[in-house]
Every structure is written in structure tokens, then in C-alpha cells.
UniProtKB/Swiss-Prot annotation:
<comment type="function">
    <text>Trans-acting protein required for termination of DNA replication. Binds to DNA replication terminator sequences (terA to terF) to prevent the passage of replication forks. The termination efficiency will be affected by the affinity of this protein for the terminator sequence.</text>
</comment>
<keyword id="KW-0963">Cytoplasm</keyword>
<dbReference type="GO" id="GO:0005737">
    <property type="term" value="C:cytoplasm"/>
</dbReference>
<keyword id="KW-0235">DNA replication</keyword>
<dbReference type="GO" id="GO:0003677">
    <property type="term" value="F:DNA binding"/>
</dbReference>
<protein>
    <recommendedName>
        <fullName>DNA replication terminus site-binding protein</fullName>
    </recommendedName>
</protein>
<dbReference type="InterPro" id="IPR008865">
    <property type="entry name" value="DNA_replication_term_site-bd"/>
</dbReference>
<keyword id="KW-0238">DNA-binding</keyword>
<comment type="similarity">
    <text>Belongs to the Tus family.</text>
</comment>
<dbReference type="Pfam" id="PF05472">
    <property type="entry name" value="Ter"/>
</dbReference>
<dbReference type="InterPro" id="IPR036381">
    <property type="entry name" value="Tus_dom1"/>
</dbReference>
<dbReference type="InterPro" id="IPR036384">
    <property type="entry name" value="Tus_sf"/>
</dbReference>
<dbReference type="GO" id="GO:0006274">
    <property type="term" value="P:DNA replication termination"/>
</dbReference>
Length: 309
């Protein structure tokens, strides 16, 4: 497929996302809102976009105010829709839930709408990350050449729809991206970097090349069977834990966007019990279960690469 055809599909898919989101928010407002609870988080400024989050103060919103914030959030796709001081790199998150009363017919209609939106979002992300054939550093410029000001994460982020929950509880999750690697795999990656000399601020090209050579030597000095692990921290994430009484099971969802909960009164479902979201404090985390960590030694800090001792 030609680059021109891909751009046409990209723009066409994005227009469909906008249209379907507008239709969904209009449709939701035609339904009876049983309960709504969302939690706004502090604005991340451009100056603080890379700073670790040690505390997060939560503001709760209820009822129609919560619904208005949530429906606007679903359609928040461009930096032009937010304050000039807000970071365009830090994701805008609005955990919470909207609960609507539905019958069998309207439940199916809303399920199909959300499924279609999520399909379009997945297709759009595939075009940018795979079909474009561009490295991650070049994708930003390419997307914004055709869709200026787009917040790509918001365009990718799918909607979560659930049916007839009994209880909904909110909390925070601290995660790491973990990837196990062999010594030879890391050496191969470093070889590729060495073969393409470049400068990486604040280092000159020569300084960066020297840094890579030192890293290569450090990895090459390890035994071939050494166990290496990338353990990169991810910023704390709001989550929702959903309990389904009939199935006697709990399901956990990431909750950067308000969940849409459909309450089917045709089937005798009732309004769920919804909990709050506490302020986040990194110094006061209580772990339900924390397994014994494997002893690790940091070997390449910029890659968050560790070797198991």
C-alpha cells in the first residue's frame, strides 16, 4: 500500500472514531443515569511531566457533574482541548464509572457501539505503530503532520464497558514493564546502536559512542548464561476491581477513563455498590501480597537493565 493510501485510511479512520464517539455520548445521555462517580486528578504541567508521582490528590465528582466530565473526557483527543500549561506527554486520566439503566435491546445497541469504537481505535493504532513502518521516534512527527495536536494515547485508549456489576472498588497499581533477555540478545542490540553513531544530548557523538562501547564491554564480560532483565517502572495507575455476584468472580481493569456500566433491569439487576478512590501516597502503600524479590544488580541504568545475582 502506498504512503498516500495509508494517510487517507488514517484520516478516514480517525474521522470515524470522532463520529462514533459523538454518537455514543449522545446515546448515553438518552438513558437514565442511575449513579455516576468520577475522580479528577491534578493537572500535570509541562515542567513536571517527567517527575515521579509521589502523591496524587483526588477530587470526587458525582451525578450529572460526573457524567458531563466523563462524556467530555471520551472525546478529549487534541491538545487544543486543554490548558496550554498542561503537559501534552502526560496522559490525562479520569478514573470512575457511569451506570446507566438499560433493557435487553438498548444494552445490545450500546455494546455494539462501544465494540465498534474500540475496533476503530485498535485499527488506528495499528496504522501508526505497524503499517507506517516508522521507528517510534519518527511516528510523532508523521501523525502530527496529518492530525496536528492529536493526543495519540487518547486516540488509542479503548473504552471499558461492563454489565451488571455488584460492586466496584477503585485503587492504585504500581507496575513495572519486565522483559527477560539473554546476554547475546543485549549484545546484539548494543551492536546495532554502535553501528549507527549519533549524538544523544547531553553527549556528543564521540562521547555517546564511548558510552555504548563501555556498556558492550560490561555485558560481554558476563557469563553467556547470565540472566538479564529489563525492569522499567511505569507511573502509578488507577484501577477498578469489579465483583460479579452471579458469577462469584472479581475482575480488575485499568481505569484511566470512566467505565461504562450497563444495569439491565429486564434481568433484575440492581444499582452496584461503588467505592471511592483514596489519595495516592507512595510512602504509605499497603501491599496485599508482596513476593520475595529476586536479587538484581543494575548494570545499564539508561535501559533499566539488571543482572540476576
Amino acid at each position: 500500500m502506498s504512503r498516500y493510501d495509508l494517510v487517507e485510511r488514517l484520516n478516514g479512520t480517525f474521522r470515524q472514531i470522532e463520529q462514533h464517539l459523538a454518537a455514543l455520548t449522545d446515546n448515553l445521555q438518552q438513558h437514565s443515569l442511575l449513579i455516576a462517580r468520577v475522580f479528577s486528578l491534578p493537572q500535570v504541567t509541562k515542567e513536571a511531566e517527567h517527575a515521579p508521582l509521589d502523591t496524587i490528590e483526588v477530587t470526587q465528582h458525582l451525578g450529572k457533574e460526573a457524567e458531563t466530565l466523563a462524556l467530555r473526557h471520551y472525546r478529549h483527543l487534541f491538545i487544543q482541548q486543554q490548558s496550554e500549561n498542561r503537559s501534552s506527554k502526560a496522559a490525562v486520566r479520569l478514573p470512575g464509572v457511569l451506570c446507566y439503566q438499560v433493557d435487553n435491546a438498548t444494552q445490545l445497541d450500546l455494546e455494539n457501539q462501544v465494540q465498534r469504537i474500540n475496533q476503530l481505535k485498535t485499527t488506528f493504532e495499528q496504522m501508526v505503530t505497524v503499517e507506517s513502518g516508522l521507528p517510534s521516534a519518527a511516528r510523532f512527527e508523521w501523525v502530527h503532520r496529518h492530525l496536528p495536536g492529536l493526543i495519540t494515547l487518547n486516540a488509542y485508549r479503548t473504552l471499558t464497558l461492563i454489565n451488571n456489576p455488584a460492586t466496584i472498588r477503585f485503587g492504585w497499581a504500581n507496575k513495572h514493564i519486565i522483559k527477560n533477555l539473554s546476554r547475546d540478545e543485549v549484545l546484539s542490540q548494543l551492536k546495532k546502536s554502535l553501528a549507527s553513531p549519533r549524538s544523544v544530548p547531553p553527549w556528543t557523538r564521540e562521547q555517546w559512542q564511548f558510552k555504548l562501547e563501555r556498556e558492550y564491554q560490561d555485558i560481554a564480560a558476563l557469563p553467556q548464561q547470565a540472566r538479564l532483565k529489563i525492569k522499567r517502572p511505569v507511573k502509578v495507575q488507577p484501577i477498578a476491581r469489579i465483583w460479579y455476584k452471579g458469577q462469584q468472580k472479581q475482575v480488575q481493569h485499568a481505569c484511566p477513563t470512566p467505565i461504562i456500566a450497563l444495569i439491565n433491569t429486564d434481568n433484575g439487576a440492581g444499582v452496584p455498590d461503588i467505592g471511592g478512590l483514596e489519595n495516592y501516597d507512595a510512602d504509605n502503600i499497603q501491599h496485599r501480597f508482596k513476593p520475595q524479590a529476586q536479587p538484581l544488580r543494575l548494570i545499564i541504568p539508561r535501559l533499566h537493565l539488571y543482572v540476576a545475582d
